[in-house]
Regions:
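N-terminal [4Fe-4S]-dependent radical SAM core
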Residues: 11-41, 48-49, 206, 212-263, ...
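A short beta-strand-loop structural module common to alpha/beta enzyme folds
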Residues: 69-81
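Radical SAM enzyme core and accessory elements
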Residues: 1-30, 34, 40-42, 491-624
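N-terminal pre-triad scaffold of radical SAM enzymes
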Residues: 40-46, 64, 250-276, 302, ...
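Canonical Radical SAM [4Fe-4S] cluster-binding loop centered on the CxxxCxxC motif
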Residues: 54, 256-292, 608-623
Length: 624
């Protein structure tokens, strides 16, 4: 138990969900301060319920705490009610386990999953009493290190971090911490530690790099400022997933969180090669965990947590080679224990539907398809390996099996998209509804009709994808496309069976700016944060007018970052990073997209993306 909470009872009684801040959850790790050498605080810059659902944090938390010389604790962004109180009463941000101020730690590690959380990073630093700019931090400040998918273009937030860890976190934290201990013993100081850290694999230390610009605002050069600092940084990768660390005792929250279940990561990476998908490129090559190990992990974690549900985690679970064996095992074992099984990321085919009928309450569940584009032409452009025939066949099988609700996910604004492609969203939704009426006899229809929920998000080009050079639509173009989709749905024969939802355009445009921005955007982030912006990922706290004011005040044009097609010879802000996928491959895929040519998946034929040099996973395994 904590000797004393950082927040007194009066404060805890005033705020929403005080259990977010008191620690002491089941499986939380508490160590003796005097018996450890390094204190590390892991941060997810969003509200507790979202951060506690993140598998990456659980893996790193468990791994770091498995070492006798390190104590890893956790911190999340305080919700707006507590934020106000902490500022008013000068309460420093604290870690959950010890309730000690973050400023007393050796490291603050921040996982960065989403661009719209950038202002929350500033909130965390500010509340902790850590200078926002890395160059203004003294010897007594924690080393602030960033990781996660957004670090594949770290430049918009480079000024706020001492180090970025590029790649998967299981491989280089031990060498980094050993270096820190060595430098502390030698009393080298902060700057020398960072200089040495910059020479470790996967470590990017922004202060040792400089950017110059052309008059038109594009990058002229990006280079190290000192000898011995690498000009190019390659991502870190776990080559053997079966032997890598996995948390057998994940922390169990007191309150309901987004993912309140045991999460079993069955593989990392994806074979599919969708051209809009950043994760599919960043996590190459596909690497599987051994099925016998997964069986053992599942039972151990269920025993250690008391959770009543287990979920398989993967970008594409259907592509896991031992899926039938694993699912048969889980169905048998979980049925005995009254444990529910969640199976996301499954392709809709006869096998998947048979499995889902065994593990789900059909009457309560909905079936999900992600066609991503309304026409086959556009699905070929984005390399989405899903045909209309497969979608309709899967729908028919599902309706025969008792499903009456279908969720469809599309993106608006893909490169080369036409009005005909957009109308295809409405037409496909209508065809699925028609399939229900053609398949299910009238007397067997629940409530008389099927419910099709069609949702559209807006396309955001991301680094290290074939679409990294593509222009993004403007807000006005996005809104026009959404209105056209809504109108087209209203004209369909089965329009009463179709419900349409769409995303906010303002947020998508800003996400696109931050995703492909450069270091100049740090001044925009500082401006909006000082104007009171944080929790921008939450619509009720997003203030687009303040962001537009910031761009104007900083003499920067957001359209420069989002709305222009970038030439292939332009230096991109993230070009100094090596994610394993070659630029030549991405250029080939960009041209294939323009030619409406599909690429086979990794199991069908190697496309020479570059990931084979890691010497692991599907790249070295026999293909089907």
């Amino acid at each position: 138990m904590n000797e004393k909470l950082a927040l007194n009872d009066d404060i805890l009684m005033k705020i929403e969900k005080p259990a977010r801040y008191i620690g002491n959850e089941v499986n939380a790790v508490v160590k003796d301060r005097d018996s450890i050498d390094v204190r590390f605080c892991m941060c997810f810059p969003d509200v507790y319920e979202i951060g506690m659902s993140h598998l990456g944090i659980q893996i790193l938390y468990g791994m770091l705490n498995s070492w006798d010389d390190v104590w890893c604790e956790r911190v999340y962004s305080p919700w707006v009610d507590l934020d106000e109180i902490m500022r008013k009463e000068n309460i420093p941000l604290f870690a959950l386990e010890s309730q000690d101020p973050i400023k007393d730690f050796d490291f603050l590690g921040i996982t960065i999953q989403y661009e719209m959380c950038y202002t929350n990073i500033l909130q965390v630093l500010d509340l902790a009493g850590i200078p926002l700019l890395a160059t203004e931090r003294g010897e007594d400040c924690p080393i602030v290190i960033g990781g996660g998918p957004c670090t594949y273009n770290p430049e918009p937030i480079a000024d706020f971090f001492d180090i970025f860890y590029i790649g998967e976190g299981e491989t280089q934290y031990r060498p980094l911490i050993d270096l820190y201990k060595k430098c502390r013993t030698e009393k080298t100081g902060r700057e020398e530690f960072l200089r040495r850290a910059a020479k470790l694999p996967g470590m990017y230390v922004p202060r040792f790099y400089e950017t110059t610009y052309h008059e038109n605002g594009t990058i002229a050069s990006f280079r190290p400022t000192e000898e011995g600092i690498p000009a190019r940084i390659r991502k870190e990768l776990v080559t053997d997933m079966t032997d890598s660390f996995y948390p057998m005792k994940p922390v169990v929250p007191y309150i309901k969180v987004t993912q309140d279940r045991v999460v079993l990561e069955i593989q990392r990476g994806c074979i599919r090669g969708c051209r809009f998908c950043q994760a599919g490129q960043l996590y190459r090559p596909v690497r599987e965990r051994d099925v016998e190990v997964l069986k053992k992990y599942a039972m151990e974690m269920l025993k250690n947590t008391g959770h009543e549900e287990i979920s398989l985690s993967s970008l594409s679970s259907s592509d896991y080679s031992k899926l039938p064996e694993l699912i048969d095992f889980l169905i048998e074992e979980c049925d005995k224990r009254h444990i529910n099984i969640s199976l996301p990321s499954l392709r809709i085919d006869a096998f998947s539907l048979d499995v889902m009928s065994k593990v789900q309450d059909v009457k309560k569940s909905s079936l999900t398809f992600a066609p991503e584009a309304g026409s086959q032409r556009l699905r070929d452009v984005i390399n989405k390996g899903l045909t209309e025939e497969v979608i309709l066949q899967g729908s028919a099988l599902a309706f025969e099996g008792g499903w009456t609700r279908v969720k469809l996910y599309f993106m608006l604004g893909h490169p080369t998209e036409t009005e005909e492609d957009i109308r295809g969203i409405a037409e496909l939704s209508n065809k699925i509804a028609a399939t229900f009426f053609d398949t299910v006899p009238k007397e067997k229809r629940v409530n008389g009709r099927v419910q099709i929920v069609t949702s559209t998000s807006f396309f955001v080009p991301k680094p290290f994808t074939p679409f990294q050079w593509a222009p993004q639509c403007t807000k006005e173009e996005f809104v026009e496309k959404a209105y056209l989709t809504r109108k087209a749905i209203s004209e369909q024969l089965n329009q009463k069976s179709i419900k349409y939802n769409w995303h906010e355009a303002d947020v998508s445009v800003l996400e696109g700016v931050l995703a492909r921005g450069d270091r100049k955007l740090s001044q925009v982030l500082l401006y909006v944060y000082n104007k009171g912006c944080f929790y921008d990922a939450w619509s009720e706290y997003f203030h687009n007018d303040v962001w537009m004011e910031a761009f104007e005040a900083c003499s920067l044009d957001p359209d420069f970052y989002s709305h222009r097609e970038r030439p292939l010879d332009e230096i991109l802000p993230w070009d100094f990073l090596d994610c394993g996928v070659s630029r030549a491959f991405l250029e080939r895929e960009w041209q294939k997209a323009k030619n409406e040519t599909i690429s086979p998946n990794c199991k069908q034929a190697c496309q020479g993306c570059g990931a084979a040099r890691f010497g692991c996973g599907i790249c070295v395994e026999p293909r089907d």
